[in-house]
Amino acid sequence: MAGNRYQQVMETLRARIEGGAYQVGDRLPAETELAASLGVSRPTLRQALAQLESEGLVSRVKGSGTFMAAPKLLHESTSFLAGYRQEAERHHRTLRTQVLSLEVQRAGSLGEKLSLPSSAQITRLARRRWVDGLGEGRPVVYTVVHVPYALFPDMAQQDFTTASFYELLEARGLKVCHASRVLEVVVPPPQVAKALELSPFEPAIYVDSVGFDARGRRVEYAQSYYPAGSSRFLIEVER
């Protein structure tokens, strides 16, 4: 019964949060008051709050109480190969994109990431993106994608403020079937921090990614920065 009670309390609080009973930054009632209003013990309430905190819905500060957290976009491992637009739509959010640069250039040192000679041409696309209701109005990702020019020669003529990068790739027979990704927490370079509207030394989650097609060709190399305060990543591992 205790387990069921904890689940009921958690769902009641989640419904209140999702229903707008609390705003970002609001302090929830004291544990004694909240437990009494819900008719449960403080240990049961704390168990429910701990679960809500793990989901990023609330933040508990020792000595100060429990506060409503800013919502975070959950990036699931199962959707890592979906475009960011599709991922936002799965969470019923609206995506807005700004293209910062789109140009053809020499591969240089990036050639190694795409199995190209340094003299080869690649197309570089830099964007920052917003998702409604997340990030407190700031961009939720800054990403730079590099693609071999020979695989997508008209990429620089596309409008990536509205077009889906992965859909355009697939229209040219370049479906990303699997990817190799490395995640780490970093202090982003100054130009990235500025694009994400981060304060100095505010951390970001950096994702370094190489995408492969069904033939094993490297079709994209992406460098993405997500503000740590508005992002969560779910990694599922099977044995």
Report residues per predicted region.
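Beta-hairpin "wing" of winged helix-turn-helix
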Residues: 22-25, 54-63, 69-70
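ATP/adenylate-binding site constellation spanning eukaryotic-like Ser/Thr protein kinases
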Residues: 31, 63, 81
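Short, hydrophobic-biased segments on the C-terminal half of alpha helices
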Residues: 49-50
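Alpha-helix C-terminal capping/helix-coil junction sites
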Residues: 17-18, 53, 170
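Extreme N-terminal segment that seeds HTH/winged-HTH DNA-binding domains in transcriptional regulators
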Residues: 1-42
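All-alpha effector-binding/dimerization core of bacterial HTH-type transcriptional repressors
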Residues: 71-239
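A short, structure-level motif marking secondary-structure boundaries and short turns
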Residues: 15-16, 33-35, 41-42, 69-71, ...
